[in-house]
Amino acid sequence: MGNNRTWSQSESLTADQQKEKLQPPSMYNVVLNNDDYTPMEFVIDVLQKFFSYDIERATQLMLTVHYQGKAICGVFSAEVAETKVVQVNRYARENEQPLLCTLEKA
């Protein structure tokens, strides 16, 4: 009842061939975008809550958003980046803030 199939040499892959086929996942930047209405304290809260930054780093990133128009909050695989964007945007809307989180290919 077992599968008695044997592998021919043409069907097997060498370790080098397997490494060539494996590609690291595409990575994406999660970006917070500036607006004229979201309080700075709310941006800091988002950075701590969803990206686990301490108060000092969250404040630095908030100031980058404020003065440069946007800041990269982290670099993640597609699935994680998409989840972070949805979570942050949902949280902003629930708190009646126009803060916008987006993703872009790293």
Swiss-Prot record:
It comes from the Bacteria. Residues 1-16 have a biased composition (Polar residues). InterPro entries: ClpS (IPR022935), ClpS_core (IPR003769), Ribosomal_bL12_C/ClpS-like (IPR014719). Pfam families: ClpS. Residues 1-21 are annotated as: Disordered. Involved in the modulation of the specificity of the ClpAP-mediated ATP-dependent protein degradation. Binds to the N-terminal domain of the chaperone ClpA. PANTHER family: ATP-DEPENDENT CLP PROTEASE ADAPTER PROTEIN CLPS, ATP-DEPENDENT CLP PROTEASE ADAPTER PROTEIN CLPS1, CHLOROPLASTIC. Belongs to the ClpS family. This is ATP-dependent Clp protease adapter protein ClpS. It comes from Pectobacterium atrosepticum (strain SCRI 1043 / ATCC BAA-672) (Erwinia carotovora subsp. atroseptica).
